[in-house]
């Protein structure tokens, strides 16, 4: 069965909670993490064993075709 693929926009505390939750579901995965900071995205990807990281949200969504995107950014 094909895994349900998420991407996460934002690499803060809420994103960490979401990545942990997804890791507990057998048929789901976080395919990519995006952040305004490429360095922060890369560190997040290493911490959670995520295959791809991006410093640009648009580039991430153009490169990765997820089933869903989790927006973990602030509202202001």
Model-identified regions with their sequence ranges:
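Beta-loop-alpha module in the N-terminal Rossmann-like domain of NAD(P)-dependent dehydrogenases
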Residues: 52-76
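N-terminal Rossmann-like dinucleotide-binding module
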Residues: 1-48
């Amino acid at each position: 069965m094909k895994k349900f693929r998420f991407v996460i926009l934002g690499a803060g505390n809420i994103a960490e909670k979401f990545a942990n939750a997804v890791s507990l579901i057998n048929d789901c995965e976080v395919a990519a993490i995006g952040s305004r900071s490429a360095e922060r995205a890369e560190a997040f990807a290493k911490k959670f064993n995520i295959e791809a990281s991006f410093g640009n949200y648009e580039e991430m969504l153009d490169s990765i075709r997820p089933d869903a995107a989790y927006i973990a950014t602030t509202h202001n």
